[in-house]
Each structure stands twice: as structure tokens, then as C-alpha cells.
Amino acid sequence: WIMGHMVNAIEQVDKFLNLGANAIEFDIDFDKDGIAQITHHGIPCDCGRKCTKKAIFTEYLDNIRQVTTPDDPKFREQLVLLALDLKLQRISSAKAYRAGEDVAKKLPDHYWQRGNSRARAYILLNIPLVEDYEFIRAFKDTLKNEGYESYNDKVGINFTGNEDLDKIRDVLEILGIHKQVWQADGITSCFARGTERLKEALEKRDTPGYNYINKVYAWTLVRKSIMRRSLRLGVDGVMSNNPDRVIKVLKEKEFADKFRLATYNDNPWEKFRG
């Protein structure tokens, strides 16, 4: 999976897909009451990027629904995964549950259209910190209460704050989540990051019977040398400002026979058995 990073304006979607991304990440900004308002990262952000691109969240969902719906004029077959980077750290932790309720209503309204949409992308909920886990509880509670619990099959969980992996496991255990879990490891492209935690996540992913990490990705990679390093370690995905660079690295002799781009037929919730 090649995740285009910080794709917050509607016009950026095609740009990142044209560069080779088969997944996109966009930021969800909430008001003080936990209501999802816009797709927006804000300052600071990655080096060399404009931090202020934005769209109204519901309008963004309406557009991305078309892009991921077969036979729609806007359909792009390669886009199979949407990563929602939930900016919960900007609101009170007490509002995390309300935020989860809100997103769990807006997705059925604007993406799945209450069962009337054929939009098919998988969705990854990126939670910044384990202290915001009530968002997940609210999201699942609300889908159930709204009668759309079946959509949980299309939704995965990911904690992005580089926290202790055992602490994350404990929270997932509290929530009763034992599947459909990704684990991110990374830092803004402005800085270098070691591989200790990334290696630990990959080791846990590959441990038989360990159900708290199904996929691992590294972010935000812009240098080809770091992309190569991550691929050698065996990541499932790379988040990048430059998907075209990832494509070029994947075509190199060292990686061409070991990796390929994920398609809709690849289940993002299953561990890869090479």
C-alpha cells in the first residue's frame, strides 16, 4: 500500500493517484464539541508541503465516494484504502466519544449513503493517542445503533502516536478488538527516525497468534534510501509525499520480485503470508 500523505483538498486526490498512490490519508479537524468540520492539517506540517489545504469534510466524502465507486465517471480503480487521520489531540479527550459518534454518522450519510452506495474502499481510522480510545467505542456503538454494524468489516484501527506497543495492545484488549489492526511508525519528513520500534512492530505482526497487529506501515518517507530500508524490513505499506518515488524503488531489481501494489482483491486486514 502506497499512501499519499496529507491529501486534504479535493483537487489533490487525482494528483496523488496519478503519482501512483493506491491509498490516501487525509486529516479530519473537529470543532471544540467534537464535530468533524474540515479536512485540514494546519501549520506545522511536512517540509516542502503546503499545510493549509482544506475541504469541507462531508463534501470531501461525497467526492471520494465517487472516486471509489465502480462505473462512476470519477472512478479510479487503484484507490482501495482511505486513512482518516483524526486530529483528536486538538480537542478535549472528553469529546472523543462525541467525535466518534459524529464520524460514524457522516460516513453512512455521505460515503456509504445508508446502503445505497457501491463505494468500496476500506477505511482506516488513525487515532493519535491511546487516551482517545473512546472514539473507537463510540464509532462502533453508533454504527450498531444506526443499523450499519456490517460496515465494521470495512473499517480498521491504527494508533499513530508512536506509543508503547504493549500499551496499545492493552487498549485494544479493553475494546475487544482482535482483528483489523494496523500499526504505524514514523515521524514528519523533516526529521530522521530510527527503526527500533518499527522492527518491534514487525516482529509482533509476525508472531503466530498475535492478533493486535495485522499490517505495519512507515511514515512519512520522502528519501529513497529510507524507503529501501523500510522495504527491506518488510513493511506492508509506506506513507509518502512522493508516491512516484516509491513506485520507482519498487521497480528496482532488489524489490521487483518481492513487492507489488495492493489491489482491491488484497484484504488489508489479513496478515501477508509470503
Swiss-Prot record:
<dbReference type="GO" id="GO:0046872">
    <property type="term" value="F:metal ion binding"/>
</dbReference>
<feature type="active site" description="Nucleophile">
    <location>
        <position position="41"/>
    </location>
</feature>
<dbReference type="InterPro" id="IPR017946">
    <property type="entry name" value="PLC-like_Pdiesterase_TIM-brl"/>
</dbReference>
<keyword id="KW-0800">Toxin</keyword>
<feature type="binding site">
    <location>
        <position position="27"/>
    </location>
    <ligand>
        <name>Mg(2+)</name>
    </ligand>
</feature>
<protein>
    <recommendedName>
        <fullName>Dermonecrotic toxin SdSicTox-betaIIB1bix</fullName>
        <ecNumber>4.6.1.-</ecNumber>
    </recommendedName>
</protein>
<feature type="disulfide bond">
    <location>
        <begin position="47"/>
        <end position="190"/>
    </location>
</feature>
<keyword id="KW-0456">Lyase</keyword>
<dbReference type="GO" id="GO:0016042">
    <property type="term" value="P:lipid catabolic process"/>
</dbReference>
<keyword id="KW-0204">Cytolysis</keyword>
<keyword id="KW-0479">Metal-binding</keyword>
<feature type="disulfide bond">
    <location>
        <begin position="45"/>
        <end position="51"/>
    </location>
</feature>
<keyword id="KW-0964">Secreted</keyword>
<keyword id="KW-0460">Magnesium</keyword>
<dbReference type="GO" id="GO:0016829">
    <property type="term" value="F:lyase activity"/>
</dbReference>
<comment type="similarity">
    <text>Belongs to the arthropod phospholipase D family. Class II subfamily.</text>
</comment>
<feature type="binding site">
    <location>
        <position position="25"/>
    </location>
    <ligand>
        <name>Mg(2+)</name>
    </ligand>
</feature>
<dbReference type="GO" id="GO:0005576">
    <property type="term" value="C:extracellular region"/>
</dbReference>
<keyword id="KW-0443">Lipid metabolism</keyword>
<feature type="active site">
    <location>
        <position position="5"/>
    </location>
</feature>
<dbReference type="GO" id="GO:0090729">
    <property type="term" value="F:toxin activity"/>
</dbReference>
<comment type="function">
    <text>Dermonecrotic toxins cleave the phosphodiester linkage between the phosphate and headgroup of certain phospholipids (sphingolipid and lysolipid substrates), forming an alcohol (often choline) and a cyclic phosphate. This toxin acts on sphingomyelin (SM). It may also act on ceramide phosphoethanolamine (CPE), lysophosphatidylcholine (LPC) and lysophosphatidylethanolamine (LPE), but not on lysophosphatidylserine (LPS), and lysophosphatidylglycerol (LPG). It acts by transphosphatidylation, releasing exclusively cyclic phosphate products as second products.</text>
</comment>
<keyword id="KW-0354">Hemolysis</keyword>
<keyword id="KW-0442">Lipid degradation</keyword>
<dbReference type="GO" id="GO:0008081">
    <property type="term" value="F:phosphoric diester hydrolase activity"/>
</dbReference>
<keyword id="KW-1061">Dermonecrotic toxin</keyword>
<feature type="binding site">
    <location>
        <position position="85"/>
    </location>
    <ligand>
        <name>Mg(2+)</name>
    </ligand>
</feature>
<keyword id="KW-1015">Disulfide bond</keyword>
<dbReference type="GO" id="GO:0031640">
    <property type="term" value="P:killing of cells of another organism"/>
</dbReference>
